[in-house]
């Protein structure tokens, strides 16, 4: 992710830019990732998603070699490359952050799938593709940065073939008027402004955009583990992270993960895989 203008779901930079997190080999990022992932599980993902999530997407969507697949908000490319390797599909990743695209292209060069995977710098609100260009689209934990989700979903619908499937993994929140303090603690921990939504909110917006909602899968146990690991990583390596991201942002993130964990335990936050399709 990165920086853009209000109206396409982004905003000007707040705190550290995603560029810092996209530099996977920086000293702080190496420490963070070693605290969260085992060597075999670290494919460059920058969310709470484990390899099991990606395997589930391949299985649930039936991704196969003949499919053309779009990865929206592809980050540093690891998940897209993993899915292409496991399924044999052709895949295009779109990412708005230049560093993310640069890292993605470096990873794909040594992956063995360079003939059927590419990563482009682009805006998901204005996808640089013709209508009906893809059979499947997916996104991993980036829906929260888009303010106008209906417009985003309509753009995804446009580039999907009739019957094409759209799946995204997203943190969902059920925050009420009594959760103002938690909301205030969550907001600074994000790198850019957040636009929370609930499962019901996502379902309504998908239908408004023209999708048919197929199924929603909620992840709790391993999601809680991942939130806890991210928080522990920031707390354990606070000094090293602060050298790269600044003391204030590091402190914000430590409190953010603590608040997030409280919401998970209270049943007010989850990670949901939401699957829908374009009619036709």
Please report, for each region that a protein language model flagged, where it lies by residue.
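A short glycine-rich, Lys/Arg-flanked "PGG" loop and its adjoining helix->strand segment in the class I
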Residues: 150-165
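Class I SAM-dependent methyltransferase SAM/SAH-binding core
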Residues: 70-72, 76-126
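N-terminal, positively charged/glycine-rich alpha-helical extensions of SAM-dependent methyltransferases
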Residues: 1-38
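Conserved Class I S-adenosyl-L-methionine
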Residues: 215-280
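Short, glycine-/aromatic-enriched active-site segment of Class I SAM-dependent methyltransferases
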Residues: 171-193
